Regions:
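Structural alpha/beta core scaffold segments of enzyme domains
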Residues: 1-273
Length: 273
């Protein structure tokens, strides 16, 4: 067998939703009303009630349409800020809107992460896949903010997309290591662990296909057929849609697949000179 190793790193990323964070709050003798495009109405109500010193039954949250959330609007800070400003102007509706700079600077970021991969190929196929990823824990930080504590035990979010891909590799292992507090606030970012683990996993599958001297799509298809037929059909579909392996002169193509939240997704990317 031929052994391959690789290391990958990804940075912290802001959500950068199209609509910067904003909320409107109105405090009267009857209580608090807040208009907020949020992803956690019950937690928003509780946090705003605490900020205003009111019982929850005197707080009404109007969950509006939002110009992108991606996990960022699951946080409570922007709704609480509007509440606190409204407390200084009772009887007057107050709207707070963050600048783009404030929105980027005060995010709860997608974690930075590092992955170290080891694999082996033999007779044109993969026979070993060993992966380790390290980075801050999104789930632990977010749950501590929302509920005041994080349940003990392994963090499945940290390794999703790394251990559960539909490839039949006979010797496979995935490990997650939660980094100590890096003093950078992290939070849920669309697709969560899959956003970096999918990249790590598929980048390394390409390395294994190259080491095996195999076509990268056919290499994946052979592994998927023995693991889960629906995933294999997805690869067959993108093969047909893209006309793989035929391509115009002066172009390059890549393929990737990721099983995320119950669905296998594959894509073919074409780059031209």
């Amino acid at each position: 067998a031929t052994e391959i190793t690789a290391e990958y790193r990804v940075p912290f990323l802001a959500h950068a939703t199209m609509e910067p964070l904003n909320a409107t709050a109105h405090i009267t003798a009857g209580g608090l009303e807040i208009w907020s495009g949020n992803q956690l109405p019950s937690f928003t109500r509780r946090a705003c009630a605490d900020a205003a010193g009111l019982p929850e039954n005197r707080v009404t949250v109007h969950t509006t349409l939002m110009g992108g959330g991606f996990g960022r609007r699951g946080e409570l800070d922007f709704s609480v800020l509007a509440t606190r400003v409204a407390m200084a102007r009772p009887g007057t509706p107050v709207m707070t809107t963050w600048s783009r700079e404030e929105d980027m600077r005060r995010d709860f970021y997608r974690p930075a992460a590092i992955a170290r991969m080891r694999g082996a190929v033999k007779d044109g196929g993969a026979v070993l896949f060993d992966a380790a990823v390290a980075g801050p824990s999104t789930a632990r930080q977010a749950l501590e903010r929302w509920m005041g504590f994080a349940p003990p035990g392994p963090d499945k979010v940290h390794v999703e997309g790394l251990w559960n891909q539909p490839y039949a590799i006979p010797n496979a292992r995935a490990r997650g290591h939660v980094a100590p507090d890096l003093k950078v606030p992290v939070g849920f970012w669309r697709s969560v662990g899959n956003s970096y683990n999918g990249f790590f996993h598929e980048s390394f599958v390409d390395e294994m296909a190259h080491a095996a001297g195999a076509d990268p799509l056919q290499f994946r298809l052979a592994l998927a057929q023995d693991a889960w037929r629906p995933a294999a059909r997805v690869l067959e579909a993108v093969r047909e849609m893209s006309g793989w392996p035929d391509k115009p002169e002066g172009t390059g193509r890549g393929v990737a697949m990721c099983f995320s939240f119950g669905t296998p997704v594959a894509c073919v990317l074409e780059v031209a000179e």
